[in-house]
């Protein structure tokens, strides 16, 4: 649970479109603004017009706020949600809704409709709060606000009694402005004996929070934990500054001066009300700062700040004069000293790279007071003028990429997201690409360029900038052992408008309609959940930061990635009751994969992490012909995937990077090792040399800390990919040592050299198996229990086939057995002993493979299998045939010409191998008629082996 911090809390207004639907984009933009300044969001309270919202709208607001916080890496910032209803039952339902939607704490106000009856018997008020707190899945904050609850003003004794009666009461908000009441409450609950007798259910200490910020300074001295006030909506940094000054005894003078100023501002904010606050927010933040273009573009303001100008023309005419221009209104208001300083806070200009827009002093709360003071809260919901309601929407329409935070967005420093750190993945209207050591751009020259405090270069070419990832600063430039930094280019998408080849625009424009024709967003959302449960634990190449909070926001995802996720999850539809109707008329997986490939093709000019993720999931598709090998497309797509990875710099280790969020570092490492594993296994299956050499990357091996922010919290997620990536490095060494063009020439005919070369690899394989956790090991049929699937079978099969790849190389010198004895007559015994050791090891591997297949259950066959599992079954089957050819006794002609050859035969091994093949054929036939056959896992191996050995075994 996220702790309930001390400090400043901002009760968010609720923004509406003209049709009274919630403006989610405006809400999320505002959440990022106030939270990035260091305040805690409070939603669905009095300021949020919760009285006008239904339950679904309240949940939507909470989900949207959580998404906004996560998008700017404020994962540790909690959400407080209003949950006061007209009855105990309704309030409990709202508490449960808030928990489901992602809130961390709820705030409950007494119901005011029957206030007279409640005031006549205050025990009913106590029971109201205690019953709610005991049933709520979230800690409860008591909300004492007499003005909106029928005059119910709970005294300190009643509040303390409620605290004593339920451990789930975590705080109180006092909007009665009674410092004495706060003092009496904290005088009791802060005592050690009280805390020992009445412990809280959460680890966070009890919080008493001011309902106004105008008495913050005096209240802190008696135990106040902060303030929930509407003023931080417009001036959050000033309010946070006041809080910080109040914590420092040496800053009492500055704290008093700022408290006085903020008290005046808070008084005006109370007068203008909710509608006034929302209109003021729009006036200051809802319109871009005017350009300074006396002679046409570019803008002089942007040029002087070494920034790219995104305005192509001067500001258009206003439909209506601003309030600050109505001098008869503004002139009647007096501005206190320092007011201009208070209102010079800035807001992110979403989607733009210019400086944040400064708030004009003429648009102060004082100027808004007289015109707006008579506007009621209900007016702010439904009765604003068209210009006003449109303005609320325009605050968020500045975002060119909803759901993604821009590089100019400033963040609050946390342990997981230091300030000024931004993602390379989410750059509105631009893409990033890795700049290598050769090519037309010289990184040594770039290292001498001027960079701002975000390590972004001052643009010299319109639409192109550079970003240093790991440069510790100019000090390093003077050292002797200076190494060039890792540099990425950032290019506007507009520069790619004429890039060719590209698809017909109509094809891509019809992408979303094609997807929604196959399934609705709700079904797609359920498929994502299935993916999270059944695929992500074994292939965690996605981050939770890439997935929206609800089905309504799926169109913010890259279409290629969304279709790939849905197609990959499609085989698991029957495990979601809500998708049973889809079983009657399921969407075409082929159509989904075609749409995915179409979108990937469009993205190849400017690929991203999502492009690579879609490529890797496209590799996981089920075969179209169960008995034939994949076409060359799989290998071609693998090469494309590696090229995409290198383009986005995935092959470089992020350990020293300081310019991206921690979650993106973790995702990059997981994604790299997912790509690495798939490339090695597809190369093995295709019999091709790997595209990826050990000198071509420096990404460190996965650690437990890297397996975070995944879509699943399964224990398999922590271990499967880690052991898979380690196993894949062993396979890579085997491929390089035995299967490169040059290595084949050295090892094919030299048994002793091959044995020496294989010895350390066999040791590594044994160590890998010995260190495998019990949950990843194959188990007997009797041990399988529960109602879930086990997708670890493909990992252990990969281990067996890695062993097969090594033994297959050792069998090559024995291909002409027993003719090899004729050639090597001088040391036949030594040759035979070496050959027998290889054959014995191969038989043990066959035994392990066959028993593995026999032990597999429906819960394992029906689970997720890596795409290379299908050729792995076939490779293991072909290995048995190869071994059979070697151990088959010599024919009668050879025996008669050289009777001593019988001495060096493998008759016993031949008999044993035949038995294992018989058992394998039976197990494969059975599995091919079940889940394994539906997925084509064993069909290819079965037809290969049957074709090779005929009916003679």
From Swiss-Prot:
GO BP of this protein: DNA-templated transcription; nitrogen catabolite activation of transcription from RNA polymerase II promoter
Residue ranges of coiled coil: none
Top-level taxonomic group: Eukaryota
Keywords: DNA-binding, Nucleus, Transcription, Transcription regulation
Keyword Ligase among UniProt keywords: no
Xref: Pfam families: DHDPS, Fungal_trans
GO cellular component labels: nucleus
GO MF term set: DNA binding; DNA-binding transcription factor activity, RNA polymerase II-specific; lyase activity; zinc ion binding
Listed SMART domains: DHDPS (SM01130), Fungal_trans (SM00906)
Region (Disordered): 371-418
InterPro entries attached to this UniProt entry: Aldolase_TIM (IPR013785), Carb_Metab_Trans_Reg (IPR050797), DapA-like (IPR002220), Transcription_factor_dom_fun (IPR007219), Zn2Cys6_DnaBD (IPR001138)
Location, primary (coarse class): nucleus
Localization per record: Nucleus
Biased composition (Low complexity): 374-408
Name of the protein in question: Communesin biosynthesis cluster-specific transcription factor cnsN
Originating organism: Penicillium expansum (Blue mold rot fungus)
